[in-house]
């Protein structure tokens, strides 16, 4: 079977310098939302099984919690696009961030299976809404001529943060504990929500 050769699409327009694009409020808002959504999800998902075992739960129970978490991460994708189309990118992204913060608050309520599993499920859905919404917001930051380099910068920021979060989660869990992690994440979410609220107000005015 022979596949047709890919056709090159003409890119019209002059691309702005990447530094100029990265300094725009639109890019800062979208990148911050994506970095915090994905970074906190990776951090907590990595730390949660260790915390569960440390609290006396079995490895099997920790694994089941991660399975529910992964299902919550990708299950909503069947309708996330429709929600974004109906309510808007910013609102769904903000909802995802609120759910991530709520997952941390639920984790602070106890060390039982219901708190761990419920927190992981909330975290998964929050990541879905937050990251997909932030990715959709990013598309408004660039022209076709700028798309490749802007997406590359955003991916570098997001997945660089994910790598650091994944490698550092165990050490931080050992240093401050499960409760300390879930308390410490809250200001990050608040900062991004404040950026988004400021940008939304600026657009309306």
Describe the role of every protein-language-model region:
Residues 129-143:
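Intracellular juxtamembrane helix-capping segments at the cytosolic ends
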Residues 46-65:
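Short amphipathic helix-loop junctions that connect adjacent transmembrane helices
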Residues 2-31:
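Juxtamembrane intracellular "pre-TM" segments in multi-pass secondary transporters
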Residues 91-106, 186:
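Structural signature of the two symmetry-related core transmembrane helices
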Residues 75-89, 173:
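Helix-to-loop junctions at the C-terminal end of transmembrane segments
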Residues 23-41, 121:
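Pair of pore-lining "gating" transmembrane helices in MFS-fold secondary transporters
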Residues 103, 114-122:
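Paired small-residue
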Residues 141, 145-178:
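A late C-terminal transmembrane helix in Major Facilitator Superfamily
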